[in-house]
Amino acid sequence: MKVAYLVNQYPAVSHTFIRREIAALEAKGMVIERFSRRRSEHGLVDEDDIAETGRTTVLLDANAFALILQTLSVLVRNPLRFARALWAATTMGFRSQRGLLRNLGYLVVACQLRDRLARSDCKHVHAHFGTNPAAVARLCALLGGPGFSFTVHGPEEFDNVWAISLREKIQDAEFVVAVSSFGRSQLLRLCAVEQWPKIVVVRCAVDDQYLRIDPPSIPEAPNLVCVGRLCEQKGQHLLVQA
């Protein structure tokens, strides 16, 4: 089975868990097509991330003329589906903190993705995260593309349920992944009981390479290391207090 993975920026320094997830699926025999909405804003240092760059299609690498031409092509070929996707993009745009124009831009990207998927014969799209990648995947499905799913990490999605149209994304998705039982409990609150079975938990983990490292000797003085982005979602100041 061929599946498309859609991320806002991929590969990226903070997205190694997505790279490992893709590698694990490929080890099980799946074929994964990587799609990134745009290029990473930061330089890559990990050799595996650098290698992923050559395997990834960046949807916004196309010039403006090509993007507009592809959008018009989708409109002409299936105006009813395009109208449905346009309505969804407009609805998301009026709610969104990013505004209508940004969400209409997601529709343009979805048209580009729709064309790429048709040529690659992908049967499903999985997006990380529940924000704009899930919006593009949803619009692509409304345009006639394959069904989609997405992974919700939180807490950003839970803090902006209305603004990112999270309920509608859950309703239209074939399934939704939470990375913890708590995350699943928050998603269950946003959908009908009949949809609860499609909310599943897939936890983030480390790979065998990490587990094969010899344990270091125990130092005389505690030496604590925290690796993570310095943003409010990570709660770094709470870790220091703890």
Sequence positions of predicted segments:
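N-terminal subdomain of nucleotide-sugar transferases
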Residues: 1-65, 146, 171, 204
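Short hydrophobic "strand-cap" motifs at the C-terminus of beta-strands
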Residues: 6, 153, 179, 202, ...
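A structural motif in glycosyltransferase catalytic domains
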Residues: 18, 25, 224, 239-240
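A conserved catalytic-core segment of Leloir-type glycosyltransferases
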Residues: 34-103
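A conserved, positively charged/aromatic
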Residues: 98, 148-174
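An aromatic- and histidine-rich active-site surface loop
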Residues: 99-115, 122-143
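Carbohydrate-associated surface elements
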Residues: 182, 205
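Conserved donor-binding/catalytic core segment of Leloir-type glycosyltransferases
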Residues: 206, 212-234, 240
